[in-house]
Amino acid sequence: MKLLIDFFPIILFFVAFKVWGIYTATAVAIVATIAQIAYLRVRHGKVEPMQWVSLGVIVLFGGATLLAHNDTFIKWKPSVLYWLMGSALLIGQLVFRKNLLRSVMGAQLQLPDNAWRTLNWSWAAFFAVMGALNLVIAYRFDTDTWVNFKLFGGMGLMLVFVIGQAIYMSRFMQEDKGEAAAATPDALPPPGVQQDKQP
């Protein structure tokens, strides 16, 4: 259900584009994102900071697209959002000495410090590349190709990257399990058999 809510605006944007075109799709994306935030606020009582940022970006660039009747603005929106997320990770690490990924996922994942740093840098680099790739597609191909990439290409690359990150993290989880097993005391003797007592 959460995954559906997360992709709700982009799916509606894609459908609206195929039926009515880029400008109607942009308006639909704005309304859908506002509805998404309202639902999260009412249902869960909390909206993540990046979701507020996403709302601000779609309203700003989507609104500019509709007012200027120029789809260049909406095509820049994904790149700006990617770069904002990447910048947040870098600023947190370099300026505030705080790993934002660890702050978000540290309760669910037990990883060494070097693994968290690698993940943080990897995600920042991924967001930088995705932002640049979005503009390459936007300026070198037609709008229909860009919209298809936005839904299928972007999601596909994200999925591949997440799988790669999961494989990387699994190495450390296996090491933790091995260390825990090595630290486990020897099994108790069968019933009726006493262990030798030290004098």
From Swiss-Prot:
It is found in: Cell inner membrane. One of its GO terms (cellular component) is plasma membrane. It is a multi-pass membrane protein. Keywords: Cell inner membrane, Cell membrane, Membrane, Transmembrane, Transmembrane helix. The keyword Transmembrane applies. The chain crosses the membrane at residues 3-23, 47-67, 76-96, 119-139, 149-169. Residues 180-199 are annotated as: Disordered. PANTHER family: INNER MEMBRANE-SPANNING PROTEIN YCIB, INTRACELLULAR SEPTATION PROTEIN A-RELATED. Belongs to the YciB family. Plays a role in cell envelope biogenesis, maintenance of cell envelope integrity and membrane homeostasis. This is Inner membrane-spanning protein YciB. It comes from Delftia acidovorans (strain DSM 14801 / SPH-1). The gene is yciB.
